[in-house]
Amino acid sequence: MIRMRTPSTLPFTKMHGAGNDFVVLDLRDGPDPSPELCRALADRHKGVGCDLVLGIREPRSARAVAAFDIWTADGSRSAQCGNGARCVAAWAVRAGLARGPRFALDSPSGTHEVDVLDADTFRVALAVPRFAPESIPLFGHDGEQDLYEADLGDGTRVRFAAVSMGNPHAVIEVDDTATAPVARVGRAVQASGLFLPTVNVGFARVESRDRVHLRVHEYGAGETLACGSGACAAAAVLMRRGRVDRNVSVVLPGGELRISWPDDAADVLMTGPAAFVYEGTFLHASV
């Protein structure tokens, strides 16, 4: 007699923010998903398909209505996700956890104030940008610089800015984002050893004082349609260098985010959409 193993069931919600897509799990009464399960969920052919997995947790701070943890498509953990924060905010509103127009969420990188602007638009205070190499962390460079240079080992030299938005970012200014070598250079910077354990690599073009185009090669996921923390990182770098105003639109392949940074000591504010796609049940032996 052949015994068929009955798979466990895992309810989930599929969401996206400007095309950056997520599998959202309610983990308030459950364990962390294993790296294997995260990879299975993220698989676009054999799973649900997503850039990252978001796990809803009970709040960790007194003023938060919920907390969330983040896993990339390769099963590794992440400390920050701007688009994910907006989606968790929308999830919290729908679940009845957040009842007013302003509330807070806890992420692995800290506590974030959220403003509900309409049914599917949220503003999140992401973080105060940190530029000191040791706070990113960036290795092999002594002292803080506006731009760093690195030899990527294949004859390619790049100039980049570096910043932490709760997670590490390298920002490279380019003439044309459409033709920028996002995958090749993004992977090379990630493998360079300059950032440990790794880094998100953004390729930015300034169109005007209030408009920036951006593509981002994320660690653990590759290029995504949008990266909220990457948009904040690019905007903060360009604002600090005087290239753009303190309130800009960042245009990504999947949509547009509004980024503002009132002053150097303030959190960067990110405004953008959060969308529910569908709800379902995932069947997997390792759940």
UniProtKB/Swiss-Prot annotation:
Organism: Streptomyces lavendulae
PANTHER family on file: DIAMINOPIMELATE EPIMERASE, DIAMINOPIMELATE EPIMERASE, CHLOROPLASTIC
GO MF annotation, one: diaminopimelate epimerase activity
GO cellular component: cytosol
Keywords: Antibiotic biosynthesis, Cytoplasm, Isomerase
Protein name stated in the entry: O-ureido-serine racemase
Lineage, uppermost ranks: Bacteria, Bacillati, Actinomycetota, Actinomycetes, Kitasatosporales
Site (Could be important to modulate the pK values of the two catalytic cysteine residues): 169, 218
Taxonomy, superkingdom: Bacteria
